[in-house]
Amino acid sequence: MTRRGLTLLELLLVLGILGVLLGLALPLLSPNRLALDQAARSLATQVTRARLEAIRRNAFVGLQVFTEGAGGYLLFVDQNANRRYDPGEEFGATHFGQGNWARVRLDPEKSALGNMPLLFDPRGIPAKPITATLVLTSGGATRKVVISQQGRARLE
């Protein structure tokens, strides 16, 4: 006689394994964590966008980080060639602490760009080759956006 079905022990073992996997995956799927990942990816993408806009426009284009409030960044075209952001030069801005990114913050103590813009020359090369790290936080989670001396951004 052959038995069909599962024993109680097998069923409990499967439920236990599923519970452990769900417990490990649940923190990664929280809305705060997803918003933080999305904000970090967006920031890295905007660094690339600034580089490509500098080449496309044949002008100095930069990314200016600001730490007021929850922080944020803006893209600008340096129209007067002073190599810094002036009001009216921006063509894209993102503010953390609003909308989908309501709990995302730029950590000014751990971010190493300060008030200096990340500026790309018309060839898409950083005007000042620096390595910068921008740290975004949401609750207890953090994501780093590291910008290399060549102007390429990566997530950590």
Swiss-Prot record:
The keyword Cell membrane applies. The keyword Membrane applies. GO terms for cellular component: cell outer membrane; periplasmic space; plasma membrane; type II protein secretion system complex. It is a single-pass membrane protein. The modification N-methylleucine is found at residue 6. It comes from the Bacteria. Keywords: Cell inner membrane, Cell membrane, Cell outer membrane, Membrane, Methylation, Periplasm, Transmembrane, Transmembrane helix. NCBIfam families: IV_pilin_GFxxxE. This is Pilin-like protein PilA1. It comes from Thermus thermophilus (strain ATCC BAA-163 / DSM 7039 / HB27).
